[in-house]
Design a protein with these regions (language model features):
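Hydrophobic/aromatic-enriched cytosolic interaction surfaces used to assemble or bind macromolecules
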Residues: 1-197
């Protein structure tokens, strides 16, 4: 039912996905209009240059260094941003400088950043969760909490299979996947319990 009057403080933030391809951005800043209001707008950055870290380890001063320590340093045309806190975890994300400038110019402090790597569905189980975009594979290994999280370049089903084998090893655990049918079909040849979501 739609609320007719008053404000709705439980309104979910608006989300905008930014896919980083070949050092560029997949949206045109001119095509994005400034939304009226004061509600936050979350930008979900699709890039393999992202890592998760405990809140107490991350500050604006060391975010880029932490990203670099994981082998995912920002390129010369990028800088790091941090996500909002989620389950005591922060995502440190590399974002294109021009994209960041456009976002800040249009939305200022209303803008926040996130990553598909922060998806903690099934976090209480022993399992692997996989989300794939056009060129990135996001994997999270859980065992009653987050054990490992990786974002890797994966443009084919075989790339995703490689990363899944590397993360799961010989364990027989469920794999929950949000991806194309081709990826799920290939994974089912190697793993017993693959569930498409």
């Amino acid at each position: 039912m739609r609320q007719e009057t008053g404000s709705n403080p439980n309104q979910a933030p608006k989300k905008v996905s930014i896919q980083v391809k070949l050092g560029g951005r997949s949206f045109s800043a001119e095509d994005i209009t400034v939304a009226e209001g004061t509600e936050p707008i979350e930008f979900v950055i699709d890039t393999p240059r992202v890592t998760l870290a405990p809140r107490e380890e991350v500050s604006l001063d060391n975010a880029a260094a932490l990203l670099s320590l994981t082998g995912k340093a920002c390129h010369s045309n990028e800088q790091s941003v941090c996500s909002e806190l989620q389950n005591d975890i922060v995502a440190i994300i590399a974002i294109d400088n021009k994209a960041l400038e456009s976002i800040v110019a249009k939305w200022g402090s209303r803008a926040s950043f996130s990553s598909p790597l922060l998806d903690m569905r099934h976090s209480d189980e022993l399992c692997l969760t996989i989300d794939t975009s056009e060129s990135v594979c996001y994997m999270r290994l859980f065992d009653g909490g987050l054990q490992c999280a990786e974002a890797n370049i994966a443009s084919t089903a075989e790339d995703t299979l490689y990363w899944a084998k590397k993360m799961v090893g010989e364990r027989d655990i469920p794999i929950y996947i949000k991806s194309s049918a081709a990826v799920a079909k290939l994974l089912r040849k190697y793993f017993k319990r693959v569930v498409c979501e």
